[in-house]
Regions:
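Short, well-formed alpha-helical segments that are part of the catalytic scaffolds
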Residues: 12-25
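A conserved acidic beta->alpha catalytic loop
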Residues: 37-46, 64, 90
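Glycine-rich, basic loop-to-helix element that forms the pyrophosphate-binding segment
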Residues: 62-78
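Short aromatic/hydrophobic "clamp" motif used to bind/position activated sugar donors
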Residues: 83
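Conserved donor NDP-sugar-binding/catalytic core segment of glycosyltransferases
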Residues: 95-124
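Short, flexible, basic/aromatic active-site loop/helix in glycosyltransferases
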Residues: 113-150
Length: 244
């Protein structure tokens, strides 16, 4: 099989069905799904298991709660050539995996990510993601490639070689992974299409102005010193997993 789709969850009963339904409709079928749960107290497990007869599916209880730990645990239990990390609240088009696979067939790529689009009609949300796409992905990649954790596709051998996500990093772990892969000589690609459709629930909780400021501050730290960027921002940004 080609892809192992890894999804960390924590109390995602309202959202997880969205991405799992999208996966059911994919035109490209060569994949398994590995959901790693951080001891949800809602009906996340029940929602996930509704799809157990739709495609190869593993639902695993994580020994430890944390988005990076859960992603790494999913990767350890994955068996395919490429790992795809999705957040539990994203949506994708029916031909998303087909387009990703076509790109991988044409080029020898170790890590791949895409532009994102908000699941929202609000102009401010479009602006925030335009900023993320153009500034934090397109422009910054000239200094050092980055990735947004809502979708990362990475060759499993490459991921394993660098030790996966750093589990003590609670903000910026996605950019950290991309940087360490790049620094180790692995190849990178950023696609404008197909886009991942991303929930704006964090915007609703934290406030849009706060999210803009947070991203600007993070980008400033990165541009000042990409080598120590991750270590410098730890503790400076509140970014909780599963707190919605």
């Amino acid at each position: 099989m080609k892809f192992s789709i890894c999804i960390p969850t924590l109390n995602e009963e309202k959202y997880i069905g969205g991405i799992l339904s999208c996966l059911e409709k994919q035109t490209f079928r060569d994949f398994e799904v590995v959901v790693v749960d951080g001891e949800s107290v809602d009906k996340t497990k029940e929602e996930v298991l509704k799809f157990s007869d739709k495609y190869p599916l593993k639902f695993l209880k994580s020994p430890q709660r944390g988005v990076s730990f859960q992603r790494n645990f999913a990767a350890k239990n994955a068996v395919n050539e490429y790992l795809i990390f999705f957040d539990a609240d994203v949506m994708i088009e029916n031909d998303f995996l087909e387009k990703i696979n076509n790109h991988l067939e044409k080029q020898n790529i170790d890590i791949l990510t895409t532009w994102n689009k908000p699941i929202s009609d609000k102009p401010v949300d479009e602006f925030i993601y335009l900023f993320v796409n153009i500034f934090m992905l397109e422009l910054i990649k000239k200094k050092s490639p980055g990735a947004v954790g809502v979708f990362i596709c990475v060759r499993k051998k490459s991921f394993d070689k660098i030790g996966g996500f750093r589990e003590k990093v609670n903000f910026g772990e996605d950019f950290d992974l991309a940087k360490r892969l790049h620094d180790s000589g692995f190849t990178y690609a950023l696609l404008k299409k197909p886009k991942v459709h991303v929930s704006v629930r964090r915007f609703d909780k934290e406030g849009r102005l706060n999210m803009i400021i947070k991203n600007l501050r993070a980008a400033t730290y990165y541009l000042r010193d990409k080598n120590d960027f991750i270590d410098k921002i730890q503790g400076k940004f509140k970014h909780e997993f599963g707190k919605f």
